[in-house]
A protein has these predicted regions:
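Short, contiguous strand/loop micro-motifs
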Residues: 60, 82-83, 115
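Catalytic binding pocket for nucleotide-activated donors in carbohydrate/polymer assembly enzymes
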Residues: 86-88, 94-164
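Conserved catalytic-core segment of nucleotide-activated headgroup transferases in glycan assembly
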Residues: 1-73
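Glycine-rich anion-binding loop/nest that anchors nucleotide
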Residues: 64-67, 83-91
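Short, intrinsically disordered, charge-balanced linker/junction segments flanking boundaries
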Residues: 81, 166-171
């Protein structure tokens, strides 16, 4: 029965992944128009460093992804320009990939699979070691993305195209 649940879960993930790909393909021209200066972040993977980023500049609007319905999460990711994830990445992490398909620039760390460019194909200037000396650099990057979203989102093209072109069984 446990195996059946895993298979069900994989089927749901495959369907969800395809749904997100289709949402992106159908809305890729509209998505930039929906964007606001918001940073969404994975609250379940939050740590002291995330809270240091949030507290560094109180004028930035950070919204946690926690306790949201699928529709609420979709709406948040469609509005936010940035998805921040400084948790541990156990593999090809689903959350950053989905956030990217909803038009978010992904800022992450080097933990787990995020240390491997092939798994988390985010340019290195969007990846940071969790050191307090990097807070100013992260803050500057957030404002750079806010002020020039289109250019910065283009830097995610390799990661985005990789996600859009992979088969479902490649991400398991």
């Amino acid at each position: 029965e446990k195996r059946l649940n895993n298979i069900k879960s994989m089927l749901v993930e495959d369907q969800q992944r395809e749904l997100y790909k289709n949402i992106y393909k159908k809305n890729k021209k509209t998505i930039p128009k929906l964007k606001e200066n918001i940073v969404s972040y994975n609250a379940t993977k939050s740590n002291e460093f995330i809270f240091s980023i949030i507290n560094y500049d109180k004028s930035i609007k950070f919204i946690p992804i926690r306790g949201l319905t699928a529709t609420q999460m979709t709406n948040l990711l469609l509005k936010s320009k940035i998805y921040l994830d400084f948790g541990y990445h156990p593999g090809k992490d689903r959350a950053p990939r989905e956030a990217l398909l909803f038009g978010n620039c992904v800022i992450t760390n080097f933990k787990g699979s995020a240390n491997f460019y092939n798994d988390v194909t985010v340019p290195n200037n969007f990846k940071f070691e969790e050191k307090f000396k990097n807070l100013e650099k992260i803050n500057k990057l957030i404002y750079l993305i806010f002020n020039n979203y289109t250019h910065n989102f283009k830097e995610m093209n390799k990661y985005k195209n990789k996600i859009l072109n992979e088969n479902n069984n490649e991400t398991k």
